[in-house]
């Protein structure tokens, strides 16, 4: 028997032995990623029909926004939710067809099947700020639809500059984690449309999910007032959120990893894929915040050979040297990560969104300077709106966002809630119940979510401190506004006390400004002349503080009061 045949026979024997129950009677087998998430759908936010319908809308809308504003395109997003009549699922639960269409960059036809049919296949596995992180969301929705409605996902897409519109109907092969295409087509593009339209069916509960879905869309419109969003509901309602600004945040850019954010496994992967011929070249080419001089100083400090070939660190017997390099990268005081890769919303856009949605009497926002945690850059932005159309509540209405995603669930688990609820708002002249809205946005190449459902952010000390500083910074401006407003109201109250007597005093003076022998009812023009003089005298003695940069005319206030008295 040849050596090859012997090896094949031994391999077959090992495979048969592995498939047989062991001494414990247990069988072992491999589970694909798709099968794992199909069996543990609650991990991705699909715990029940209510949450599943909400999560499906959220995942598709986030993909649309990433494909538009992140590429400098003013977003147009159309969402349709329709109940499928006579197709109740398990337990009589209704089924729905969800369609989301956008005007984004589209998906290349060569990637369409994998992008929608393979779990953890994504364009987001780079160091860049995106709404999605795991390459899971839309595939989790497709899996849930397969399991509850038994229908494929239908995708139409056209990229910018393409002459064709492509269509695919596919399902995910759960055992193999591969797309199975059921139908495909392509058509000549008649217009200039580019973007993606995704349609899938699933079990859901619209009556329970409605409030969350509407709130999600409203909060998306707050954070993205540059987007035009249309929502058609199963109730026959159409919600339209027009674009209120054409100003877009700057698109995010891909960045190199920072040395403080790299672990041993990531370092191994980088060493395998690098084209650098020396360790010094590897450090300069593959990391941010490392130039030639920094690389030389770093290698000298830790006694590492600058001419060592990177792949030498992956050979047997080099484990200690590899760990030494990884520890040194974490320890050395490199420059902070660059933040120009991030895409903050900007204080102007935050204020536009809050004004449009809440019509407040005062609004302020701040976009803080970049900071970093564990080698990952982040920017905290905060907006506060007060009064006007805001309903008074026993605590602030908190709007949480991470990489422009509205976070609606798990509020009390979030670091933003921890900070906002711990602030003594009375120090800022806010007494509850009060009409107060606080918006917190965290932009980062790696948001520290508490789970794959992306609903709450961990209380990382650096992020917590920045949120607190940002909230307090805007709250101080609110306090200044409220203090000036209180002084103005007090001045107006005093003005009312004086001004309401002006008509009566004017008539009396008209009598007494002539000798007693000529007393007679004064003429209206005489009273009017004296009244005008009194209005100017009283107005000169009223000092109104500027409120939100504006000062009301004291004379106009006195005149309004006098006119109201005359009408009584």
UniProtKB/Swiss-Prot annotation:
Ranges where the record places region Disordered: 1-26
Any Pfam family the entry gives: HATPase_c
GO BP of this protein: DNA topological change
InterPro entries: HATPase_C_sf, Ribosomal_Su5_D2-typ_SF, Ribosomal_uS13-like_H2TH, Ribsml_uS5_D2-typ_fold_subgr, TopoVI_B, TopoVI_B_transducer
Compositional bias of kind Basic residues: 1-12
UniProt cross-references to CDD domains, sorted A to Z: HATPase_TopVIB-like (cd16933), TopoIIB_Trans (cd00823)
Single GO MF descriptor: ATP binding
SMART domains per record: HATPase_c
Catalytic activity: ATP-dependent breakage, passage and rejoining of double-stranded DNA
Record's keyword annotation contains rRNA-binding: no
EC number: 5.6.2.2
Keywords recorded for this protein, A-Z: ATP-binding, DNA-binding, Isomerase, Nucleotide-binding, Topoisomerase
Residues that, per the record, bind ATP: 63, 102, 123-124, 132-139, 454
Function: Relaxes both positive and negative superturns and exhibits a strong decatenase activity.
HAMAP family in alphabetical order: Top6B
Family statement: Belongs to the TOP6B family.
Assembly and oligomerization: Homodimer. Heterotetramer of two Top6A and two Top6B chains.
Protein name (database record): Type 2 DNA topoisomerase 6 subunit B
Species of origin: Aeropyrum pernix (strain ATCC 700893 / DSM 11879 / JCM 9820 / NBRC 100138 / K1)
Lineage: Archaea, Thermoproteota, Thermoprotei, Desulfurococcales, Desulfurococcaceae
